[in-house]
Regions:
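Active-site beta->alpha loop and helix N-cap motifs at the rims of alpha/beta catalytic domains
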Residues: 1-144
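A general structural signal for well-ordered alpha-helical segments in protein cores
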Residues: 3, 28, 60, 64, ...
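Structural signal for hydrophobic packing residues in well-ordered secondary-structure cores
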Residues: 13, 35-36, 40, 68-75, ...
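Electropositive phosphate-/nucleotide-binding environments in soluble metabolic enzymes
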Residues: 22-25, 29, 37, 57, ...
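Catalytic alpha/beta core domains of metabolic enzymes, predominantly
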Residues: 128, 142-248
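Short, well-ordered beta-to-alpha junction loops that form the rim of enzyme active sites
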Residues: 139, 167, 261
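Conserved short secondary-structure transition element at the edge of the structured enzyme core
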Residues: 200-202, 239-270
């Protein structure tokens, strides 16, 4: 259900900064229809690229509900519900379940710098409180917290924890986690540049920034890699390499929102 290219969709904002800034619902709907038409395999709402850290809890729930309602079951919706407060993560995950999200993506608690045991207890508390499929999210470059493979394997035994978005670009971790957590545990990358190799090492797909602007190419590349067509996947991967790099010339999501603005999908607000 959660394989292939899953877009880490941006959250379109009406131009403005401060209390007058609002979610641009028509632009969001237009983007979602574009992704469904282009073959995107799932939508990830309010993740890092969706500016989860700057949305209020109310805005989080509004965006998740809007996306679930617009998509209307045509492809899966994964809701970003992580927080550096366990109570807030539980609250956001509850909201996602109530509005009909198919799964949740929970980033490691940022800024707090928890121990591995602290990470285990945090995720265990969320998983045991809310009955919805949950995907761990490890992105130490953004959080100053690295969830190690042994901790991920340990968490894989808990009901409702179905996989991990492993965004370190450390391909050695794919086999470490796969060997420990088993074949059914979902392994997703968050690094567009290494997606092809991640899948060929045994991963299941990507939660992608690049898919915001090249959804069909990312979907096709993932499908080729998953089918074992190394040459076909490599050809598409080579075509996408420059785009991957350009979308990270500044902090995500600044470049990708700039491109979407230039393409006419969204207004200029970040």
């Amino acid at each position: 259900m959660f394989t292939g290219s899953m877009v880490a969709i941006v959250t379109p904002m009406l131009t403005g900064v401060g209390p007058d800034t609002k979610i641009d619902s028509p632009a969001l709907e237009n983007l979602l229809e574009f992704h469904i038409e282009q073959g995107t395999d799932a939508i990830v709402a309010v993740g890092t690229t969706g500016e989860s850290a700057t949305l209020t809890e109310e805005e989080h729930c509004i965006v998740i509900k809007q996306i679930v309602d617009i998509v209307n079951g045509r492809i899966p919706v994964i809701a970003g519900t992580g927080a550096n407060s366990t109570i807030e993560a539980i609250s956001l995950t509850k909201c996602a379940k109530e509005v009909g999200a198919d799964a949740c993506l929970l980033v490691t608690p940022y800024y707090n710098k928890p121990t591995q045991e602290g990470l285990y207890l945090h995720y265990k508390a969320v998983a045991e409180t809310i009955d919805i499929p949950q995907i761990l999210y490890n992105v130490p470059s953004r959080t100053a917290c690295d969830m190690l493979p042994d901790t991920i394997v340990r968490l894989s035994t808990i009901k409702n924890i179905i996989g991990v978005k492993e965004a370190t670009a450390d391909l050695a971790r794919v086999k470490q986690i796969r060997n420990g957590a088993g074949a059914d545990f979902l392994l997703l990358t968050g690094d567009d540049e290494t997606t092809k190799d991640f899948i060929l090492e045994g991963g299941d797909g990507v939660i992608s920034v690049t898919a915001n602007v090249a959804p069909r190419a990312m979907h096709e590349m993932c499908m080729l890699a998953l089918s074992g067509d190394i040459d076909g996947a490599s050809n598409l991967d080579d075509m996408l390499k420059d785009l991957h790099k350009e979308l990270f010339v500044e902090s995500n999501p600044i470049p990708v929102k700039w491109v979407l603005h230039k393409l006419g999908f969204i207004q200029a607000g970040i």
